[in-house]
Each structure stands twice: as structure tokens, then as C-alpha cells.
Amino acid sequence: MTTHDPASRRARLRQYQEELLERMQAARTGSGQRTHQLGVEIGGERFLLDLLEAGEIVPVPPLTSVPLTQPWYLGLANIRGSLVGVVDLARFFGMQDAAATGPAARLVTFAPSMGMPCGFLAARVHGLRQAADMTPSAGRLVDADGTAWTPLALGALAQDERFQQVGLQAGH
């Protein structure tokens, strides 16, 4: 029996469907451990985002600047007909590197369930990471290659007063 044999393909498809069903049931009941996170690069550092807090990942669209806003607020982007505020987290966090540019840069939006039409620029998206396989070290997680990742809670960021205040205050 070869791998191109119809019976073999049906067996592989059945196995795949069973595994997918198990994963979907675990996600629905919460019995599965959520350890997959999205790896992104911001300001030359690597961060891990909870997949439930991350929305779309798109190439950086044209931005419309908004006057009298904080320097880290880059403006508005139209994502599939919805206006999304775009933030430079590197500037917001006071990092040296400026806004992410170049072919690898992406706009990562907050999940719609967060109720905040916002996104941030990532210099690079590193894909899914398995946090359970990493070693905690001084508030960060270190992977098998020795790369340190900082957890980034978008929910906590969305609740931050400074993050919510994109307009310049009088006298600034």
C-alpha cells in the first residue's frame, strides 16, 4: 500500500479529522492548555501574545495621520472597511527603535472580542510559539535556541490609562 493509495488517504484524512475534532472540543470546553502564542518583534525585542487577544495580521496599509495625538499614535488604517487606530508600541514603551518599516513589517490588530479597534506595528511576525516548551527567566521566557521572549498582554495594555489617552493634553 502506497501513500497515494485511496484507502491510505482516507485513513490519513480520518485521523486528521479526529485530531481536529479533539482540538476543537478542547478549545470549546477549555480543557486544553492554551500554550500557543504569537511571536512578534517590536523595537528590536521579541514578544509573545496570547492568540485570543490577537486579531488579524496584515501588511501595513496606508495610514491617515490624526492631528494633536501622542507621537506613538501613528494614525488610522482602513482594514476591510473598519477604521483601526495604529500604535507604534516601540515608541509607547520608550524603546530606541522607531516604527517598524520594511517588507516584513505587519499590522497586528487586537481581537474584536477586546472591543478596541486598535492595532500595532510589528517589525516581524515570528509565528506560533509553544510557551510550554520555554524556560521562565527574569519575567521572560527563553526558548530552546536561547532567544528571550517577553509576554505582552494586550488586554492589560488596552486598560492602561496612558494607552487610552491618544490625544495630546493641553500644555504638552
Q: Which stretches of residues belong to each language-model region?
A:
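An acidic, low-aromatic, low-complexity terminal/linker signal
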Residues: M1-H172
